[in-house]
């Protein structure tokens, strides 16, 4: 009897090995699949949150300039309205670029909440617009740039730097209009379709911010 028991144990052993092998194989492939899925998952970072925030800000600035355009036309300041159209298009391009970058990371941009804007006279809107641009150029984007540098997010870093340059130009155009009391000449505004930089001259071959060809700029 003792001999038979030993034989039974030996015979059952290969089956146990087979079952264990199958189990280990399944566990291995399951683990590999999880690892692959984890690699595809984008880990949340402050820069990604900043992209959502910047997208919302740019969309609200776009809407703000559209409202300011209507007010300038009402106040019979057509040239100021033309400036606002160019700035509105510029902000729209900024927002679209933030969307593209988020989607390239497989992240769907959040729907931005509308910011209430009080629309005064055309002259008042010029001062309000300049204040907004100075905050973005002097405070918001420098902070976003520092974070992108720390988190080693080169694409976001480059995008933030380019938009900061574009916003600096916005401020320059608005200061000029304010200094003249809104009495600005009729200008042909050129907006870079790649980064939203605004020019008032064609006496250059490339965009100062993103190096795109001026020949491809949108005429406003």
Segment roles from a protein language model:
Residues 29-31:
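C-terminal motif of bacterial Sec signal peptides marking the signal peptidase cleavage site
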Residues 33-220:
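Non-heme di-metal
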Residues 18-27:
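Bacterial N-terminal signal peptides
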Residues 3-19:
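Bacterial N-terminal signal peptides that target proteins for export
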């Amino acid at each position: 009897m003792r001999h038979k028991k030993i034989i039974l144990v030996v015979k059952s052993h290969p089956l146990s090995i087979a079952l264990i092998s199958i189990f280990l194989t399944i566990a291995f492939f399951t683990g590999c699949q999880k690892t692959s899925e984890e690699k595809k998952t984008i880990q949340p970072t402050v820069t990604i949150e900043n992209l959502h925030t910047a997208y919302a800000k740019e969309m609200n600035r776009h809407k703000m300039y559209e409202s300011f355009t209507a007010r300038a036309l009402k106040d019979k300041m057509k040239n100021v309205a033309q400036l606002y159209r160019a700035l509105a298009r510029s902000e729209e391009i900024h927002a679209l670029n933030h969307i593209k970058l988020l989607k390239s990371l497989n992240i769907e941009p959040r729907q931005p909440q509308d910011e209430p804007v009080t629309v005064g006279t055309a002259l008042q809107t010029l001062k309000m617009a300049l204040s907004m641009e100075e905050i973005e150029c002097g405070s918001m984007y420098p902070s976003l740039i520092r974070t992108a540098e720390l988190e080693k997010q080169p694409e976001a870093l480059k995008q933030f730097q380019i938009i900061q340059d574009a916003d600096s130009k916005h401020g320059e155009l608005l200061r000029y209009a304010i200094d003249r009391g809104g009495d600005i000449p009729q200008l042909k505004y050129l907006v870079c379709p790649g980064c939203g930089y605004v020019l008032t001259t064609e006496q250059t071959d490339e965009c100062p911010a993103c190096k795109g060809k001026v020949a491809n700029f949108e005429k406003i």
